[in-house]
Each structure stands twice: as C-alpha cells, then as structure tokens.
Amino acid sequence: RARKIYRHEIGNFKDKDKLIFEEKSEAFTVSIGLSSDEKYYFINTSDHNTSEQYYFNVDESDPLPKLIMKRDRGVLYSTSSWDGKFYNHTNKNAEDFKIDITDSLEKQDWKPFILSKKEVLIGGLTFLKNWIIRSETSNALDKLFVRNISTNLEQELIFSDETIYVPGVSLVQRDRDTDEVYLGYSSPKTPSRVYKYNLSNKSKILVKEQEIPSGHNPENYIV
C-alpha cells in the first residue's frame, strides 16, 4: 500500500526528496492529485469505507498539507476546487452521497450544492470554464446533468433517443475553456459510440463507433 507522499525537485537526486505526508494506519492507502483548476494538490487517504483529505497550494515551496475534515468511520468524501470555490462529494448524512460547496476550506461554511436524493446515487463533478457536468444513477440507469455556471441553470444532458443506455463524459483535452466534450455511451442494442458534443448549441458529431466483425444493425433489436 502507498503510505507516503514526497516532494521531489526536478534535477535533484531521490535522496533529496522531502517527506510531506505519511499515513500511519496500515489499513489506509494514500494518493495525490491535482485539482481541476490546477491550484491545489489534494492528498487522499482511505480504506474501503472511510476517507480523509489534505490539501496544499501548488505554489508552496515547502508544503504543509492542511486537513480538510477529520476521518469519521463510514464517511467518504472527496473535495475539488474550481473558480474560487470548493466542492465536497460526500456520504456524510447522505447514504447515496450529496455535494456541498464553500468559498473557503479554512472557514468551511459548507452549503448544499446538490442535495441527497432517496435511492439516487449522486456522482462527482466535471468542470469546464462555463459548465459543470455531473452524474446520477437511479433505477439502475445512469444520467448526466449539465449546469450553466453563469445562469446556474441545470438540465439533463440527453443525447440519445434510447431509453436505456450508459452515458459517460471524458475530457480528452486539457483545455477547460471550451463548450465541447466527448460523450460516450452504449446500450443493449447499440455498440459503444463516442460523440463530440457542444454543450452550448447541443450539436453532436459521431467520432468513434465500436466495430462488430459479424455486422450489427440496431434496428433489428427491441429493448
């Protein structure tokens, strides 16, 4: 299990690396990731049902990770940052998760962003300059929702006329200043497809489709 995080300065030898975080519990595994806005590093330490996070600014030359919320058995959470705000995806007092928002991790004045819903699994967030995309799962069906940041209006992102399908979003480019995302989906009667989708005008272009060597016609199937 990964238990330590070191700071390495490019050009220096490994023995010069500085330990900045160490997990004492053998049951927990440590990972580190860059925030969506590339302003913070988040250190995550967790086992299968409990997590704890620390953060520090990317500009810190001598990082001192700060605790976000102390671990609480059975509570999972994951914090992200975007446009001066912090978002916390957690199952604290929310069996199927919720998302809270705050302007400061020091004050932690958390307010609801996405409320928990009965028998609806709330997924995480994907950030673009003008949009926030998130997922939900209910009745074994996955859905995507897109929120316009300037208007704060949210609507379901529907890009297929099929009732039963599995959608997903992938950012294949690092540029967040765009209205275009790559959306993939598959269904019981349709092979996997990837579309380039414009969130602003809702246009889509098919860019990839799974080939079935024996041939396949979706119209021959009823779901």
What are these regions (language model features)?
Residues 2-46:
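Polar, glycine-rich mid-to-C-terminal structural blocks
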Residues 108-128, 137:
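Generic long, charged, amphipathic alpha-helical segments
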Residues 99, 132, 194:
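Hydrophobic, well-ordered secondary-structure elements that form the walls
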Residues 9-13, 57-61, 102-106, 199-202:
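Short loop/turn segments immediately following beta-strands, especially the blade-tip
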Residues 29-57, 62-80, 112, 123-124, ...:
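Non-catalytic accessory segments flanking enzyme active sites
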